[in-house]
């Protein structure tokens, strides 16, 4: 019998790095809504009283970037000066430039099927049958905790909560399956007039217990709520936020490998984003088809070249079909060229702001087409099962 612990973390929409991600993706969506051919690489930095937008944009759209940034911050909940950051009054500096023509000539083609990758790189996608959304359990429940924190903050159930929060979930695994919650950490920003005891009780009863599976809670489960004792100063006042700083939160919580490229602020011509989504789509359909209990896909590209330089499939000993055959099936049934991905997943749409908090994967809301399992039957038939 194999027994071990595994931990993943998440952060709320009001965490400064996630605020930066959401601003970058709000800029992306604003451009795509007016100019589907726009090329965007928008980076955001946010700190006390100021938002800085940088990066490269080529578009015919006329965007009020300052208004996009302010509205995003206010939607998250930073709209009163007593929180230390106010979307109405903060400064916004825009230093967005144009995309290099050297990159554009490698990406743009007369025939869209020949569209080259916007950069070299490697991307991964992963799926596991340990949750209903075919994601690793630790990151799934870490996300659900901070989503619940936002829910009870916004619906007035716990009105003294503030937007910044972090969660961390440690699960006990036996023979590769999660069986118990070992430790939960939840740190949440709050109003200054709350005691630690009040915060501790409310967080456990109103956030943690409604989210975690009851059968996984044991007498040894530990709850660590605001373990420093106080969390009043938060958001961009407490920490500087930058786009792309939460790439493990965005993906699989450390359970799968990562190619290093972030997602937010990048239009879908950039394979850092689109190919990672495609890899998740492929891996999820393989697991949904019953071809493996766990599956990780790697794909790589060269700048300006349409065909992937490599595709590999790893099933960690859980596959019902050998990896060589699975790789052939992937090549035959999924077009992983940049334009093929855009078409397959219908990515040239303003759908990205919603991805920028609570994870890009395991989300079954509208606007996450890479979470569909519509190819499962097709590839199961191809495998002869």
From Swiss-Prot:
One of its GO terms (biological process) is one-carbon metabolic process. It is found in: Cytoplasm. Binds 2 divalent ions per subunit. Binds 1 potassium ion per subunit. L-methionine binds at residues 56, 99, 239, 270. K(+) binds at residue 43. Keywords: ATP-binding, Cytoplasm, Magnesium, Metal-binding, Nucleotide-binding, One-carbon metabolism, Potassium, Transferase. Belongs to the AdoMet synthase family. This is S-adenosylmethionine synthase. It comes from Alkalilimnicola ehrlichii (strain ATCC BAA-1101 / DSM 17681 / MLHE-1). The gene is metK.
